């Protein structure tokens, strides 16, 4: 158990911002309600957000450990949707870098998907949007 605790602490200490992340968050925060939907250990995820001072941008943070289900399970998304005031699937976009959890979860939940794919990888998944740089979000959302 001590090893796991140390591993989670070190994992939580490893946080960095993707290019343009802060700039985009500052813009999106003014116009949209933003939420974090993430798998993982709550302590680790909160620590990462705190290290980068990002919590202030998000209305709520949904973490699999606290919910009891992981993305891409529909139960994870059902829980999130029930806890978002005036939730509207038609006005929802999941943005993520994982095909298996973020994009598949969005498909399962029947919400629009935006895959952040900086490495120009290929996929056969039917996604709404694919971006290679966070600045590309401006084109999608305007």
Feature map (PLM): residue ranges:
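Asp-based, Mg2+/Mn2+-dependent phosphohydrolase catalytic module
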Residues: 26, 35, 40-142
